[in-house]
A protein has these predicted regions:
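A short, structured beta-strand/loop element
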Residues: 9-38, 108, 113, 175-178, ...
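Short helix-coil boundary/hinge micro-motifs
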Residues: 1-15, 19-21, 153-158, 163-170, ...
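Short microdomains enriched in Cys/His and/or Lys/Arg
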Residues: 71-90, 123-139, 156-171, 221-237
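Iron-sulfur cluster-binding cysteine motifs and their immediate structural context
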Residues: 57-68, 102-120, 131-148, 207-218
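Ferredoxin-like iron-sulfur electron-transfer modules
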Residues: 35-50, 82-103, 113-134, 146-152, ...
């Protein structure tokens, strides 16, 4: 993915692109993702709207040239772990870089991911802590096994998601999964990670990354998909 300085994301390599709906549990808390409508990335490159104002989302239609937005890419080049707090628990550690919060709220059920990590000597708390940290789409939270010091990560194929948050009535960022590289038009390559969320509403203060602003402004992309496809995790428990 190339992030143009004043326009769209240019996607190369034809990764699959689909809506990813945040689905709630019985308490209306974020619990799993479910795939929605698929979109083509056959065009090489495929231009994905970054300003939030396109009339043919998720694709760019040139609206960025007249839209009321600040396209500047202000995110620092630091690695995600460089600014992360470490939460120490019984059998787990969890890294937390709050700057990358996208307000997906998978960390809230059953207490919260921080409390569950601290209580991870308990097998059920450990299982839930790993689940909640791993579901964080941006990688803000990551659970680590204290014995091996290896992170818990879903094995994502290179793919893109358009996050849809039906509980709060907003559309989220561009979920970049499976180590797809993202670089500035000028050449700088951002840290390559398994989980990244880039801004689609045009209003993040940490571009190109999403900072959750879409939730406070209730930004909607107007896509007409439904959550009918595969779920993450595959078995919803």
């Amino acid at each position: 993915i190339t992030v143009t300085e004043e326009g769209p994301y240019l996607v190369y390599g034809r990764p699959p692109l689909a809506e990813q709906f945040i689905m709630p549990n019985e308490s209306n808390e974020s619990w799993y993702f479910q795939q929605g409508r698929l979109f083509s990335t056959e065009a090489e490159p495929t231009a994905i709207c970054r300003c939030g104002a396109s009339h043919r989302k998720p694709y760019c239609d040139g609206s960025h040239e007249k839209a009321d937005w600040d396209p500047r890419l202000t995110a620092r080049p630091d690695a995600l772990l460089d600014g992360a707090e470490v939460i120490d628990g019984g059998t787990l550690q969890m890294t937390d870089n709050e700057k990358y919060c996208v307000f997906a709220r998978f960390c809230h059920p059953h207490g919260d991911a921080w409390t569950l990590t601290e209580a991870s000597d308990d097998p059920e708390a450990r299982k839930l802590a790993i689940r909640e940290a791993s579901m964080c789409p941006s990688g803000r939270l990551t659970a680590w096994d204290k014995e091996t010091m290896k992170p818990f990560e879903f094995r994502f194929e290179p793919s893109l998601g358009l996050i849809e948050d039906i509980t709060i009535g907003a559309s989220g960022g561009l979920w970049i999964r499976g180590g797809i590289p993202m670089r500035r038009e000028g050449g700088h390559t951002y840290e390559i990670r398994n989980r990244v969320v880039a801004c689609r509403c045009g209003q993040s203060a940490n571009k190109p990354y999403c900072d959750g602003t879409h939730a406070s402004i209730k930004w909607k992309d107007g896509l007409a998909g439904e959550p009918v496809g595969e779920t993450l995790p595959e078995e919803v428990y």
